[in-house]
């Protein structure tokens, strides 16, 4: 009956003022969100001051500029002593960024034949990133949409409604995170591992089906976790934040003399969410005057185990998250806190890595599972009078995956990588029924399989010039053989200048939800869907100014054919997924950054793009023409106490209702103290410090064309290490 809800981020409590203030400002707030009227609101309990947009934007840049000069002064004071205090490991991290996910072997990011950003554990700490979504908000070309249930990620102006991040391949230590029902991957509080366990995040732009097959459509994000040797300690973390949000984590990690290495961790999260959320679309006495009360809660838990012994590595991951839905999506009853979704994801992964002569090999076998269920409170009679009907929607998947990779250098100039993969979908079950009175709408069971072989050759033509060619062939139970090629060139024009060019094809096969989900009073299945395909061209130039500053610029052009998009079935009038007309996505982006030895670092980036239907010329929905990011981190006390700020600007977007949604700028301010005492770290953040009112575009399942987002919020976190290993 109900298609599974879409996107995630948090929201702003709008009903915390006296009643007379609420009544006069609701319509004004709604119009501001829809039109993009840029008004910042500075509030107290009794006073509301309207600040013009120009002044607000100026304040943002003046604030960041002031921080830069403060940081520069602090940097000059401590410049002489800082380098001497750095460990060899710290110096190594400053000089070289390595990436594995771009080519399935470890290489310098500058040598990868594609555009790569690496976010380190230190950056996660400095900017107090709470979720993977927070990280991606600060990355060039990425933007995040939250519909108060799930979080969606857009890349370079491309994000489609009804897409549970299915066009981005998410990896956890090289293991595919996307499930086998929706191809979904989740980046909010439902991400499988705690942010404190992450060593680095590799963000690889562009299609990569030549190495990974279906789903590596517009980007690959590979999250690398820490190992036991990185902790050598017990660790306890606790945090508290706005809206009665609390989280706790217990972690143990160590490496033993026998060579055994372990990392074990568990965490719990609970947030009551906003006590009251106002939605003008439901502003009537029958719907509590548009106020959703106590309907924004979020609860999650996760467990993680990493065991390494000699050439073997075992990963175990389990995560579950329940989110209450305040938006009355899918025509559910407004202001009923029983409407909620639960997503659970886990896997057991066994790896064997060994050097056979000159061949570096990796074998992997894994068993994965995914469980989703939702309760949707429905008013089928449309009278607004209880009792209402609880509709139960569920999806359960399990699958086996086997992979083998091998790489070596041949004839001194060829770095050859070859591999194979086989996946057996043991279970793809979708279920929907009314609980009382019982009425079954859907009970669909499927199985599937996929096999693939791929080959890549990195040919060093001469010292500073390399040519990369890759090809993967995928065989799918339902679809014909698909070939995914990639050609790339990497040229070092000088000691500090790199030029890259890439041409690649990629595809995404229709998932089980898009193809087989059918409920007579809701969705229509479409077993005739074809895989969608993308052809991509990209050029990038990067230059390093000494050891401190770097600049990069890129241009990209993508053509997408047979795009799988939600539409309306002309026969039933119900939603249905269809292959749509070709899409063109093109643009340019640049980034300027600096990182000093004393810890002062900053980054500014901008993306300008245009995404349109080739057939009609219509602008794509949820596609901001411009995104801009600013990050700045300042060491205030000899690399032990940092103050950081980051800002994101998103321009006007077109909603699914074909209305325009105004742009916005949000600024966050955070701090991090490493070893406040010998055993304590403390960090915290003030998010959306100017309390900006803004909204994101909802999907077709929402009556709201825009979903209000969080205003000002805070978090503070304390980490304690009661025992440090002497090894």
Residue ranges and their predicted role:
Residues 209-210, 230-231, 239, 251-340, ...:
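Periplasmic-side early beta-strands and strand-to-turn transitions of outer-membrane beta-barrels
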Residues 460-467, 552-560, 578-655, 719-720:
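Gram-negative outer-membrane beta-barrel transporters
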Residues 333-355, 395, 442-448, 496-498, ...:
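Outer-membrane beta-barrel signature, preferentially recognizing the C-terminal barrel domain
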Residues 306-322, 342-479, 492-494, 549-556, ...:
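Face-selective signature of the C-terminal outer-membrane beta-barrel domain
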Residues 96-116, 133-176:
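Extracytoplasmic beta-strand/coil segments of soluble accessory domains associated
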Residues 253, 301-303, 341, 353-355, ...:
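Conserved C-terminal beta-signal and adjacent last beta-strands/turns
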Residues 132-135, 152-157, 168-173, 188-191, ...:
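N-terminal periplasmic accessory domains that precede
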Residues 176-205:
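Short acidic/polar hinge/loop motifs at secondary-structure boundaries
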């Amino acid at each position: 009956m109900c298609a599974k809800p879409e996107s995630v981020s948090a929201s702003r409590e709008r009903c915390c003022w006296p009643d007379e203030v609420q009544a006069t400002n609701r319509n004004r707030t709604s119009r501001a969100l829809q039109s993009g009227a840029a008004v910042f609101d500075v509030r107290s309990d009794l006073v509301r001051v309207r600040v013009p947009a120009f002044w607000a934007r100026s304040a943002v840049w003046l604030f960041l500029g002031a921080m830069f000069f403060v940081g520069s002064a602090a940097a000059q004071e401590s410049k002489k002593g800082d380098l001497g205090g750095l460990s060899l490991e710290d110096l190594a991290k400053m000089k070289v960024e390595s990436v594995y996910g771009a080519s399935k072997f470890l290489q310098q990011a500058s040598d990868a034949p594609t555009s790569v950003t690496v976010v380190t554990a230190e950056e996660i700490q400095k900017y107090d990133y709470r979720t993977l979504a927070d990280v991606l908000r600060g990355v060039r070309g990425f933007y995040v949409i939250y519909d108060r249930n799930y979080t969606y990620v857009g890349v370079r102006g491309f994000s489609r409604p009804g897409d549970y991040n299915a066009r981005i391949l998410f990896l956890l230590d090289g293991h595919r995170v996307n499930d086998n029902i929706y191809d979904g991957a989740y980046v909010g509080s439902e991400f499988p591992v705690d942010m404190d366990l992450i060593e680095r995040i590799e963000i690889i732009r562009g299609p990569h089906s030549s190495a990974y097959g279906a789903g590596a459509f517009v980007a690959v994000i590979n999250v690398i976790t820490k190992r036991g040797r990185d902790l050598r300690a017990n660790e306890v973390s606790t945090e508290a934040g706005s809206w009665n949000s609390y989280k706790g984590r217990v972690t143990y990690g160590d490496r033993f003399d026998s060579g055994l290495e372990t990392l074990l961790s568990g965490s719990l999260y609970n947030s009551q969410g906003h006590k009251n959320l106002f939605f003008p679309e439901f502003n009537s006495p029958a719907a509590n005057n548009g106020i959703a009360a106590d309907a924004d809660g979020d609860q999650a838990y996760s467990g993680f185990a990493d065991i390494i012994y000699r050439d073997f590595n075992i990963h175990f991951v389990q995560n579950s998250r329940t989110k209450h839905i305040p938006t009355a999506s899918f025509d559910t009853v407004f202001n009923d806190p029983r409407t909620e979704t639960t997503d659970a994801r886990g896997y057991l992964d066994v790896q064997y890595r060994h050097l056979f002569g000159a061949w570096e090999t990796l074998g992997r076998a894994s068993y994965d599972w995914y469980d989703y269920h939702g309760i949707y409170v429905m008013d089928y009679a449309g009278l607004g009078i209880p009792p209402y009907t609880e509709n139960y929607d569920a999806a359960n998947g399990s699958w086996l995956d086997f992979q083998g990779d091998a790489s070596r250098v041949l004839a001194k100039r060829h770095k050859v990588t070859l591999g194979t993969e086989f996946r057996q979908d043991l279970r793809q079950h979708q279920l929907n029924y009314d609980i009382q009175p019982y009425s079954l709408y859907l009970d669909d069971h499927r199985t599937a399989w996929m096999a693939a072989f791929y080959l890549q050759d990195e040919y060093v033509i001469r010292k500073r010039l390399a040519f990369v060619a890759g090809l993967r062939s995928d065989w799918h139970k339902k679809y014909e053989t698909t070939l995914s090629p990639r050609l790339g060139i990497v040229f070092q024009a000088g000691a500090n200048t790199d030029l890259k060019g890439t041409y690649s094809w990629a595809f995404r096969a229709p998932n089980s939800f898009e193809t087989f989900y059918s409920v007579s009073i809701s969705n229509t299945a479409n077993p005739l869907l074809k895989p969608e395909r993308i052809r991509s061209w990209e050029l990038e130039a990067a230059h390093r100014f000494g050891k401190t500053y770097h600049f990069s610029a890129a241009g990209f052009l993508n053509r997408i054919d047979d795009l799988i998009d939600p539409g309306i079935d002309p026969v039933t009038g119900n939603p249905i997924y269809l292959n749509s007309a070709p899409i063109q996505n093109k643009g340019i982006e640049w980034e300027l950054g600096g990182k000093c030895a004393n810890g002062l670092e900053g980054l500014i980036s901008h993306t300008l793009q245009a995404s349109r239907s080739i057939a009609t010329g219509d602008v794509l929905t949820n596609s901001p023409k411009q995104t801009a990011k600013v990050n700045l981190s300042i060491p205030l006390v000899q690399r032990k106490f940092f103050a950081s700020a980051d800002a994101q600007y998103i321009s006007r977007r077109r909603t699914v209702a074909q209305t325009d949604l105004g742009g916005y700028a949000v600024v966050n301010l955070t701090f991090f103290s490493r070893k406040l005492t010998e055993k304590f770290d403390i960090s915290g953040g003030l998010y959306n410090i100017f309390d900006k009112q803004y909204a994101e575009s909802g999907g077709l399942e929402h009556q709201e064309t825009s979903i209000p987002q969080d205003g000002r919020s805070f978090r503070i976190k304390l980490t304690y290490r009661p025992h440090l290993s002497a090894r």
